[in-house]
From Swiss-Prot:
The gene is ZCWPW1. Residues 317-383 form the PWWP domain. Changing residue 302 to L: Loss of histone H3K4me3 binding. A zinc finger (CW-type) spans 250-304. Residues 1-103, 137-237, 436-648 are annotated as: Disordered. The keyword Methyltransferase does not apply. Residues 61-79, 88-97, 209-237, 453-471, 585-595 have a biased composition (Basic and acidic residues). Pfam families: PWWP, zf-CW. Residues 604-618 have a biased composition (Acidic residues). The CW-TYPE zinc finger mediates its binding to trimethylated histone H3K4me3. This is Zinc finger CW-type PWWP domain protein 1. GO terms for cellular component: chromosome; nucleus. The modification Phosphoserine is found at residue 636.
Length: 648
């Protein structure tokens, strides 16, 4: 028993002593990976060492199995994530492959800016411009998959080696789409390549369709312009017809008439076919054609317009009137809108509500129009009687005026709207243009109804001259003629030469002033004899010599306001002169007009020298008149010969 126990103890102690050294323990624990080659210790063949070595291997296998069990769900999750990411990428590519409205508008604007020739000739430049507008589609899996990194858990790479990423660049075959740049790993299939190709084809087709649409829009714009021109040419007559109704002013206004009763005074709106110029002055509400507002007790019709839109006009387009221009007779016409301005009345200022001028189209053979002031217009019914009297006196223009009257009476029988359409400027102007009688005489003296007006002016002047010659009430014309005669003044005594010279200068000045001012003052130095009788001064009696000194002073004093200047006819004697002096005193103010400034320069000695005997002076004048035979023969036609007499 003792021997067996000792042997057991020795057997139990034996292996303990063998594995005691630390070098062997560290050596036995060295292999840590299953792939490393197994190293066997020489000389060790006991089962305990094999059991101990097998323990770490089992633990490592268990760990690997656990790791593989953990990696299985993670790989499935990664596959699901990849599938979702690929789907999202495909959706984004589809969205980006289809043009948005903003991109399409930008492309259309760029193409419209370029001309059609550049678009056809430079296709490459156009494609480049389009690709510059398109946004590049870039899909990188490294960016879209932030959770996936290169690791040893990849199914295709069991050894844990990383594979470098490669770039695949796919450009459309037409070069029209933007380049799509994406990164992928080796071994991964491209997601849905057929869909991408179809998307690229649809992109190119869409852009081609966009080009065609742009070209169609440009071509259609040109065709539209041509069609518009054709339509304007075709519808020109229709536009003119509309202008006759609208631009002529007929459709522009609403006519209101005020009741003449002072207790009423309401404004009533008239229908479109009523001419307000034909209405009487005592118009009242019961004369209104509108049944709803034909009594004074009915309230006034409401109107929502502004007061600034109201014009207190007496005529409307279509009113027949008589128009008068300066130097021409009254002529029948019709109120109508100006074809250039589109208005039929004008104001002197924008603050006025009463028109100052109306546009008139004259009746007659010639088509003429003009802007006539209000004070040169009359109603057609007012001047008919006066015109009949005028026709008796003037027969030269009766034919043309008769044609105009016939036309006015014909226009008076129809409504206002038809009147404007038939007798308006455009309709008559086109008719005269087709007949070769196109004469537009506006805003000038030539817009008179006929050429016979000049003859009328000449006849009026001749009639005036004849009336002035035959009419005894007009003595001014005679005096003007007397002033125009160049009669030489006569002097008195030895100073005849000096008086003659001074008289001539004064006569010229006075004549110029009297003609300029139309005054009838005769020249002062009318007393005396002609040059043929200037040498008979020595034969005159003594009292005439006393008048030598006062005569020179009286020449200046004769134009003063305090002196009287009277005209005496040559056939009258001394007694006739005395009787004619009071009657001619009424004409004294006319002779005071010229040279009124010289009145203050007359000295008082002139008044003293003028206190001579008037009777003696008149006797001397009678003797001179009796001796001058030549003067009687020259003035035998009966004209007055003025003699200046001076006195208080």
């Amino acid at each position: 028993m003792m021997t067996t126990l000792q042997n057991k103890e020795e057997c139990g102690k034996g292996p303990k002593r063998i594995f005691a050294p630390p070098a062997q323990k560290s050596y036995s624990l060295l292999p840590c990976s299953p792939n490393s080659p197994k190293e066997e210790t020489p000389g060790i063949s006991s089962p305990e060492t094999e059991a101990r070595i097998s323990l770490p291997k089992a633990s490592l296998k268990k760990k690997e199995e656990k790791a593989t069990m953990k990696n299985v769900p993670s790989r499935e999750q990664e596959k699901k994530r990849k599938a979702q990411i690929n789907k999202q990428a495909e959706k984004k590519e589809k969205e980006k492959s289809s043009l948005t409205n903003a991109e399409f508008e930008e492309i259309v604007q760029i193409v419209l800016q370029k001309s059609l020739q550049e678009c056809l000739g430079m296709g490459s430049g156009l494609d480049f411009a389009e690709t510059s507008c398109a946004q590049p589609v870039v899909s990188t899996q490294s960016d879209k998959e932030p959770g996936i990194t290169a690791s040893a858990t990849d199914t295709d790479n069991a050894n844990g080696e990383e594979v470098p990423h490669t770039q695949e660049i796919s450009v459309s075959w037409e070069g029209e789409a933007a380049p799509e740049i994406r990164t992928s790993k080796l071994g991964q299939p491209d997601p849905a390549p057929s869909k991408k190709k179809s998307n690229r084809l649809t992109l190119s087709k869409r852009k081609k369709e966009a080009h065609e649409k742009v070209e169609k829009t440009q071509g259609g714009h040109e065709h539209r312009q041509e069609d518009r021109l054709k339509k304007t040419v075709q519808d020109h007559s229709q536009i003119r017809d509309q202008q006759k109704g609208e631009i002529s002013g007929f459709g522009q206004c609403l006519v209101w008439v005020q009741c003449s009763f002072p207790n009423c005074g309401k404004w009533r709106r008239l229908c479109g076919n009523i001419d307000p110029s034909v209405l009487p002055d005592n118009w009242s509400c019961d004369q209104n054609t509108d049944v709803q507002y034909n009594r004074c007790d009915i309230p006034e019709e409401t109107w929502t317009g502004l007061e600034s839109d109201v014009a207190y006009a007496s005529y409307i387009p279509g009113s027949i009137i008589w128009a008068k221009q300066y130097g021409y007779p009254w002529w029948p016409g019709m109120i109508e809108s100006d074809p250039d301005l589109g208005e039929y009345f004008l104001f002197t200022s924008h603050l006025d509500s009463l028109p100052s001028k109306y546009h008139v189209t004259f009746f007659g053979e010639t088509v003429s129009r003009a802007w006539i002031p209000v004070n040169m217009l009359k109603n057609f019914q007012e001047l008919s009687l006066e015109l009949s009297v005028m026709k008796k006196r003037r027969n030269d223009c009766s034919q043309k005026l008769g044609v105009a009257l016939m036309m006015a009476q014909e226009a008076e029988q129809i409504s206002i709207q038809e009147r404007v359409n038939l007798f308006g400027f455009w309709s008559r102007f086109n008719g005269s243009n087709s007949n070769g009688e196109r004469k537009d005489l506006q805003l000038s003296g030539l817009n008179s109804p006929g050429s016979c007006l000049e003859k009328k002016e000449k006849e009026e002047e001749l009639e005036k001259e004849e009336g002035e010659k035959t009419d005894p009430i007009l003595p001014i014309r005679k005096r003007v003629k007397i002033q125009t005669q160049k009669t030489k003044p006569r002097g008195l005594g030895g100073d005849a030469g000096t008086a003659d010279g001074r008289g001539r200068t004064l006569q010229r000045k006075i004549m110029k002033r009297s003609l300029g001012r139309k005054s009838t003052a005769p020249p002062a130095p009318r007393m005396g004899r002609k040059e043929g009788q200037g040498n008979s001064d020595s034969d005159q009696p003594g009292p005439k010599k006393k008048f030598k000194a006062p005569q020179s002073k009286a020449l200046a004093a004769s134009f003063s306001e305090g002196k009287e200047v009277r005209t005496v006819p040559k056939n009258l004697g001394l007694s006739a002169c005395k009787g004619a002096c009071p009657s001619s005193a009424k004409e004294e103010p006319r002779h005071r007009e010229p040279l009124t400034q010289e009145a203050g320069s007359v000295p008082l000695e002139d008044e003293a020298s003028s206190d001579l005997d008037l009777e003696q002076l008149m006797e001397d004048v009678g003797r001179e008149l009796g001796q001058s035979g030549e003067l009687q023969h020259s003035n035998s036609d009966g004209e007055d010969f003025p003699v200046a007499l001076f006195g208080k």
